[in-house]
Amino acid sequence: AYSLQSQDYGKIKYIAELLTPGLVYVADTAPFAKALAALKLANTELVASANAARIDGVTPFSGLTETKPGRALDAAVAAIGPDTIAKFMFTSGSTGPPKCVINTHRMLTANQQQLAQVWPFLAEQPLVLVDWLPWNHTFGGNHNFNLVLRHAGTFYIDEGKPLPTLVGATVRNLTEVSPTIYFNVPAGYAALLSHLENDDALARSFFAKLRMIFYAGAALPQDLWMRLDAVAVRTTGTRIPMTSSWGTTETAPAATAAHFLIDRAGVIGVPLPGVDVKLVPAGAKIEIRVRGPNVSPGYWRQADLTALANDNENFYKPGDAVRFADPKDPAMGIIFDGRLVEDFKLMTGTWVPVGILRIGVLAACSPVLQDAIIAGENCEFVGMLAWLNMAGCRSLISEEVSDTPASLASHPTIREHISQAVGRWNAEQRGSSTRILRVLLLTDAPSIDANEITDKGYINQRLALERRKADVDRLFMTSPDNAVIVI
């Protein structure tokens, strides 16, 4: 995403300047030529399996594989210990610029042992994953990749993505290969669900060997949970366990997990073995902090961030909020309650719970919305900017229409569906902080370059609001234009 989808290469330049890598590898120089040209690589060895761009000074990868192992390699391997740096992993930038997290061997191996203890079924049958999640982020690159290594499983790389133009590849792959566990982010399930509901062959293949459905990376709207459950029962005659966990790049990544049956989205379980969790009052919410062998020692060449990462008892502070699933029984786990930095106050001083409100309204408007930005800081009411789910919109429209975001955003059936759905949602709310009074449908995709969306599909609420200030202003005009849906 940083090198092929980007237009300004801002993130990859930032990463290269921070890391000063001694070696950069690309499979082929041709697709990466512009990105490589944007970097200062005069003192960096460039290695490639193919050099279609004919860049001077490139080291062929085949030459490296001809090197004979010797004492130097043996010594390097022998020097590896628990606190040796295994990799640098950048955060996804969900709430700010990506941070360079130190990942040690202790972190990665401890986390896999923790998962093995709470998911003993992993040892009962060969593990098979079909996975698109990027390896430059901790969900795909640590959690899933290392899970396959730990359990000697099979990893099928899915070239698809949760986008209308790319989800077709995922559908083809899942029709051919039946996973035993399926990992995805909510955006991935949103893109895949309509295909599972309408393609019996896909559903049969998908559920044939499936032992568990897992989501993480963001909160899953309850309607997606219910639709997944329904298609599983329709296809197999039984419910497939659905679960989640919570963690960050700094926790390698899992810190909590729901290793028991749950019946709703949002529950992130209890601390993994060896993990201590501290719950701290934070205004009207409860902040979660964590320590354990899977927690990072800090950030690379970012001493200021490292100094702020932990509290005086060495608990890492991720800035997330939680609440008990059952206040009378902590063993029932905790529920993710949003990111503290995303919440804001209305003019009345009332806090708006952005994370909970966002997933609630997305569920209420199912199946037509893909994602949303909640707005209204220092305003009299809450508004919402939203992106359409193209497949979901088409399922509601009987006649032929132009298949573009702009045409669907102006279609009366879609607008009426949203107006009615949000109206029903509002009627169930007790206060102004969880009622949406205006909606504006966005017709341009969120920008990776502007850090508006991460490459795992999570919307950075704060940066998206800043980038779309003009759209936010339209929401709160005294007399809004016709594109704004007034509830």
Feature map (PLM): residue ranges:
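Conserved ATP-binding/catalytic segment of the ANL
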Residues: I286-L346, V484
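Conserved C-terminal "lid"/linker of ANL adenylate-forming enzymes
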Residues: F344, Q370-A375, E380, A386, ...
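Gly/Ser/Thr-rich phosphate-binding loop
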Residues: G63, H151, V171, T180-N184, ...
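ATP phosphate-binding P-loop of adenylate-forming
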Residues: D83-V101, Q112, A116, W246
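Adenylate-forming
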Residues: V295, D329-G360, C393-P412, S432-S433, ...
